[in-house]
C-alpha cells in the first residue's frame, strides 16, 4: 500500500495547533472469555462454576501485576459480560483489556503476563478460558526532519481568529471547564518534539514502513479534553 509513498502525514483534531516528532503508545488488546457452569446461587451453589469469579480473579491478578510493570505502562479493562441475575451462578463472563507502553516489545511481554493472570483465574474456578486476541499496534517512529518541515509550514499558514459568534460560543463552553485557557492560544503552534502521546494509533504501524509525521489543529475550544461532550459540541 505504501511502496510508492515518499512520506505520510496524519492529522488529529485538538484544542490547539501542534506539531513535532512525537511518538505514541504501542497497544495490544485482548478479550478473555470464561465458560463455567450455571447453578442456583442459593439452592445449589456448590454445583456452579462461576465464570464471573474467573473474571474477578483475573482482574485482581492484573491489579497486582501493575506493581511489577515498567514505568509508563497502562493497563485498563471493562467487563463486557458478567451474568444476568444474581441468583444464578454465571456460566459465561467476558472481560476486555488494553495494554499500552511506549515500547512495543514491552507490550508483548506484558500481554504474555496478563494471559497468565487469566489462566490463573480459570484454573482457580474450574472454568474454561478462551483468549481472544483483538490485535496490536506499534508506537509511532518519530521523524524529526518531517516534523520540522510540518511545524514550519503550520506556523506560516496559521491565521486563525474567532468572530463574535464563535467567541461567544467558546466562552459558553469554557464555563463548563475547571481550568480555562486563553482563546488567543489558537494563534500559537505548540512544539511536541520529543514527547510521547498517551494514545495509540495504527499510524504507528505505518511509521515503521514509510517516513511519517503528524500535526493537530485547533478545532475545539481551547482547553477542551478529547473524547468529551465539549469536543463533540465544537462540531
Language-model features and meaning:
Residues 1, 50, 143, 202-205, ...:
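Poly-acidic low-complexity segments
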Residues 167-235:
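Zn-dependent metallopeptidase/amidohydrolase metal-coordination segment
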Amino acid at each position: 500500500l505504501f511502496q510508492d509513498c515518499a512520506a505520510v502525514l496524519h492529522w488529529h483534531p485538538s484544542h490547539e495547533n501542534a506539531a513535532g516528532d512525537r511518538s505514541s503508545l504501542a497497544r495490544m488488546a485482548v478479550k478473555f472469555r470464561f465458560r463455567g457452569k450455571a447453578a442456583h446461587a442459593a439452592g445449589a451453589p456448590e454445583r456452579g462454576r462461576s465464570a464471573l469469579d474467573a473474571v474477578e480473579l483475573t482482574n485482581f491478578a492484573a491489579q497486582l501485576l501493575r506493581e511489577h510493570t515498567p514505568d509508563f505502562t497502562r493497563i485498563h479493562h471493562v467487563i463486557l459480560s458478567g451474568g444476568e441475575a444474581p441468583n444464578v451462578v454465571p456460566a459465561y463472563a467476558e472481560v476486555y483489556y488494553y495494554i499500552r507502553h511506549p515500547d512495543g516489545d514491552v507490550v508483548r511481554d506484558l500481554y504474555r503476563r496478563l494471559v497468565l493472570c487469566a489462566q490463573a483465574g480459570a484454573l482457580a474456578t474450574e472454568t474454561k478460558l478462551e483468549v481472544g486476541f483483538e490485535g496490536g499496534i506499534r508506537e509511532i517512529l518519530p521523524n524529526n526532519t518531517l516534523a520540522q518541515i510540518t511545524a514550519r509550514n503550520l506556523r506560516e499558514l496559521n491565521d486563525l481568529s474567532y468572530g463574535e459568534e464563535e467567541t461567544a460560543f467558546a466562552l459558553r463552553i469554557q464555563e463548563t471547564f475547571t481550568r480555562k485557557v486563553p482563546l488567543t492560544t489558537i494563534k500559537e503552534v505548540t512544539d511536541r518534539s520529543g514527547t510521547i502521546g498517551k494514545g495509540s494509533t495504527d499510524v504507528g504501524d505505518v511509521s515503521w514502513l514509510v517516513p511519517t509525521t503528524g500535526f493537530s489543529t485547533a478545532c475545539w475550544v481551547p482547553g477542551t479534553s478529547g473524547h468529551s461532550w465539549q469536543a463533540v459540541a465544537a462540531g
